[in-house]
């Protein structure tokens, strides 16, 4: 039994054999797989080609952050000039990372202004009820909820009908 234990204790870290390519330098990383540092430069000699990887998500244009936070007020003359001017022209530039840069030479035209409609609210006075309300009968009792149930308007009306007969 001690022979097996001694053999197990002598085991070292298992190394995964790496292919040895002449001209390629292997770089070990934390994980089990490393990478070859020179594969991009010298890979074409060995029939290996790596495509350049672009950004994972589209990059925001920097002018979003450089704009002033306040909107300048415009005169009505500026608005009319913008409406009568020619439509905008834009210049598109493409750089090597397939990102597009668009620069506007003029402002886009503003939509035509619509006349504002004003609405007036007419107040109506509530009409008087044609039938006068009958006075309610209140009786003092310490009946609690029973007294409240007995003094409901329906009960009072039934009691009046009985009293009138």
UniProtKB/Swiss-Prot annotation:
Biased composition (Low complexity): 120-135
Segments of this protein annotated with the region Disordered: 49-165
Ranges of compositional bias, category Polar residues: 94-106, 139-157
Protein name as catalogued: Uncharacterized protein AH9.3
């Amino acid at each position: 039994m001690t022979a097996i234990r001694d053999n197990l204790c002598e085991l070292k870290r298992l190394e995964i054999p790496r292919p040895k390519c002449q001209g390629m330098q292997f770089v070990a990383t934390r994980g089990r797989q490393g990478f070859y540092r020179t594969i991009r430069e010298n890979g074409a000699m060995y029939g290996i080609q790596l495509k350049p990887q672009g950004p994972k998500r589209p990059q925001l244009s920097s002018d979003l952050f450089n704009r002033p936070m306040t909107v300048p007020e415009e005169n009505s003359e500026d608005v009319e000039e913008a409406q009568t001017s020619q439509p905008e022209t834009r210049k598109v530039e493409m750089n090597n990372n397939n990102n597009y840069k668009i620069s506007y030479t003029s402002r886009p035209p503003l939509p035509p202004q619509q006349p504002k409609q004003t609405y007036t609210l007419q107040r109506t006075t509530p009409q008087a009820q044609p039938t006068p309300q009958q006075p309610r009968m209140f009786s003092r009792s310490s009946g609690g909820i029973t007294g409240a149930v007995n003094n409901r308007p329906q009960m009072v009306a039934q009691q009046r009908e009985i009293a009138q007969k």
